[in-house]
């Protein structure tokens, strides 16, 4: 599964998500760190309670651990918080990323700077 980065509320940054400003603001206010299959979660792995969850047709990522093998894919500086959230939520069995991103995820987890 792909691990999406956190939505941002920034006029200078175009969102990777096709959502209106109200939805982006709701996700930012809910402290969304990233998403898997349209399910947004915090850096601690908790699902974000937003109105968006009622408007997306997708697998419920809480069901992912029941599958034999769930492999997450993500890399780069912008994905560090989202990868850590996915790992904290126990949504993945394995992760494919680059060394630099893996080191930053471990550093963030070790520093308890959640």
Q: Which stretches of residues belong to each language-model region?
A:
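Conserved phosphate- and dinucleotide-binding cores of soluble alpha/beta proteins
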Residues: 1-114
